A protein has these predicted regions:
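Short metal-binding segments enriched for Cys and/or His
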Residues: 98-110
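Short acidic/polar capping segments at secondary-structure boundaries
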Residues: 112-114
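Long, charged N-terminal interaction/targeting segments
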Residues: 1-64
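Flexible glycine-/small-residue-rich
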Residues: 33, 67, 110
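Short cysteine-rich clusters marking metal-coordination/redox-active sites
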Residues: 74-77, 90-93
Length: 114
């Protein structure tokens, strides 16, 4: 389960931002997860609930998760299409010359402080 490592990285980033901005308590964090990333949202939130117990600055901090749709670009016909629905082969022209544009990311979108 690599979600725990992801949570530790998120916590490190939050601690760094809090220190730079003289923040002592974080109320919530919003995370964007691409729908074809390898991060499983409910594993991430379970790990989050466990990990924040060890960080006073994050006591009671809620993690909000937003899923970003995966979009693929076709080099053959120059169109975008939904990756999960159609896979790697372009539904417009049948080309296999396709590239994932978005949907594999994991971002800290927003941090709410007290």
């Amino acid at each position: 389960m690599h979600e725990l490592g992801v949570v530790f990285h998120i916590i490190d980033s939050l601690e760094e931002v809090a220190k730079e901005n003289d923040v002592t308590q974080i109320q919530s964090v919003t995370i964007e997860i691409g729908e074809v990333s390898t991060v499983i949202p409910h594993y991430l939130t379970d790990c989050w609930e466990w990990a924040i117990k060890k960080k006073p600055m994050l006591t009671g901090c809620a993690m909000k998760v937003e899923i970003l749709p995966a979009i693929t670009w076709c080099d053959g016909c120059k169109q975008e299409y939904p990756t999960v629905q159609h896979g790697r082969i372009c539904p417009y022209c049948g080309s296999e010359k396709t590239w994932l544009l978005k949907g594999n990311e994991l971002n800290i979108k927003e941090v709410e402080v007290l």
